[in-house]
UniProtKB/Swiss-Prot annotation:
Its EC number is 2.8.1.4. It comes from Bacillus anthracis. It catalyses: [ThiI sulfur-carrier protein]-S-sulfanyl-L-cysteine + a uridine in tRNA + 2 reduced [2Fe-2S]-[ferredoxin] + ATP + H(+) = [ThiI sulfur-carrier protein]-L-cysteine + a 4-thiouridine in tRNA + 2 oxidized [2Fe-2S]-[ferredoxin] + AMP + diphosphate; [ThiS sulfur-carrier protein]-C-terminal Gly-Gly-AMP + S-sulfanyl-L-cysteinyl-[cysteine desulfurase] + AH2 = [ThiS sulfur-carrier protein]-C-terminal-Gly-aminoethanethioate + L-cysteinyl-[cysteine desulfurase] + A + AMP + 2 H(+). This is Probable tRNA sulfurtransferase. Keywords: ATP-binding, Cytoplasm, Nucleotide-binding, RNA-binding, Thiamine biosynthesis, Transferase, tRNA-binding. Catalyzes the ATP-dependent transfer of a sulfur to tRNA to produce 4-thiouridine in position 8 of tRNAs, which functions as a near-UV photosensor. Also catalyzes the transfer of sulfur to the sulfur carrier protein ThiS, forming ThiS-thiocarboxylate. This is a step in the synthesis of thiazole, in the thiamine biosynthesis pathway. The sulfur is donated as persulfide by IscS.
Length: 403
């Protein structure tokens, strides 16, 4: 007897009201996309739960893809048996025996959705538990802190048996919360900010500023690799590569060095806002953490925010560096981020940047030079690419080869 189903629990989505069907539909669509490489799978999404019928597909491979889908709280590997006592007992034992690791204790949990089942819950517990005890060695019951919880859901005609419970990514399905533009620098912080934004159900497009020849092709590839890594958590990431050399050279020449960092960030915001308007995005996300560097003080953020009417989302604002690194390691972006290639933020770095820049001064310095043509040129010459999960791209290429 093998696992035939995966039962998915929604978590936070269950708090939604009239628009819950939209959340469920989006999650189902995202799951179907992530499981494209498993053609035999069938998915049924109800108001409270999602049922994935494996039809012979490898449950471990499917589980590995499911764990990165936002909107899933937990999921269980399940066996489906007839709602007859002997079948339930055999199924419970089979599921228990498939649990890996050092198992010494267990308990039985029974949920009778089908109230006409001839036995009550308190009668079923010793029957099922006793069958497991009779057919195993050195195993005891522990109802308070068991190594394994054998869950039985009894329905009309059939029952689900579950032992293996796994955590999902949590959050909300990507796509239910609109779209934002993420400033993706290539450092540790901004990919984590993108990940946390997606976790709230928001689609992301990334904007990266590069300044050749001061930044290398390897630095550019590093950002492409980061965007590629983020596709594990969504359908695709659109990456906009913005040429920033002329803007930076002009800032370095025309703006006092203490304000060059502030003005550079303001130019980035202006350009990103223009791209956001083109792409129908509703906000801008950055990887700023309060007080981490000179451009991330409250005074700096206040001055930088002046140039955009878009909401600026800062998911990392109260995190320290170790907290951010921990998430980066967990999501697979850390090793890419620490590749030793410079980005445009490290080019022309001033010796003493202003930590409390004033809006009035920034505006006065910028007024001495017309940056509008440079902004227009940067937006017009951006390079845009769409990145998808490697497995999905491979499947699509394989399909195209048939024609």
């Amino acid at each position: 007897m093998t696992y035939e189903y995966i039962l998915v629990r929604y978590g936070e989505m269950t708090t939604k009201g009239k628009n819950r069907s939209k959340f469920v539909s989006t999650l189902k669509d995202n799951v179907k996309f992530k499981l494209k490489k498993f053609p035999n799978i069938k998915i049924d999404a109800t108001h409270d739960r999602m049922y994935i019928q494996l039809n012979g597909e490898d449950h471990e491979a499917v589980s590995e893809r499911l764990k990165d889908v936002f909107g899933i709280h937990k999921f269980n590997l399940a066996m489906k048996v007839p709602s007859e006592l002997e079948d339930i007992k055999k199924g419970a034992l089979a599921a228990f025996l498939q649990v890996k690791g050092d198992v010494k204790t267990f308990k039985i949990t029974v949920h009778r959705s089908y109230k006409h089942f001839p036995m009550r819950t308190m009668e079923l517990l010793p029957e099922i538990g006793g069958h497991i005890l009779e057919n195993t060695e050195d195993i005891t019951v522990d109802v308070h802190n068991p190594d394994v919880n054998v869950r039985v859901e009894i329905r009309s005609g059939y029952s689900y048996i579950m032992c293996d419970e796994r955590m999902g990514a949590g959050g909300l399905p990507v796509g239910v919360g609109g779209k934002v533009m993420v400033l993706l620098s290539g450092g540790i912080d901004s990919p984590v900010a993108a990940y946390l934004t997606m976790k709230r159900g928001v689609s992301v497009e990334a904007v990266h500023f590069h300044s050749p020849p001061f930044t290398s092709e390897r630095a550019k590839q590093k950002v492409i690799d980061l965007a590629q890594e983020l596709t594990k958590y969504c359908k695709r990431v659109t990456l906009h590569l913005v040429p920033f050399t002329e803007v930076q050279k002009t800032i370095n020449k025309e703006i006092p060095s203490s304000y060059s960092m502030t003005v550079m960030r303001r130019m980035m915001m202006r350009i990103t806002e223009r791209i956001a308007e083109e792409r129908n995005a509703l906000a801008i996300t950055t990887g700023e953490s309060l007080g981490q560097v000179a451009s991330q003080t409250l005074d700096s953020m206040h001055t930088i925010n002046e140039v955009t009417n878009y909401p600026v989302i800062r998911p990392l604002i109260t995190m320290d560096k170790l907290e951010i690194i921990k998430i980066a390691e967990e999501i697979g972006t850390y090793d890419i981020s620490i590749r030793p290639y410079e980005d445009c933020c490290t080019v022309f770095t001033p010796a003493s940047p202003a930590t409390k820049p004033k809006r009035e001064k920034a505006n006065r310095f910028e007024a001495k030079y017309d940056f509008t043509p440079l902004i227009d040129e940067a937006v017009a010459n951006k390079e845009t690419m769409v990145l998808q999960t490697v497995e999905v791209v491979a499947e699509e290429e394989k399909f195209e080869e048939l024609f």
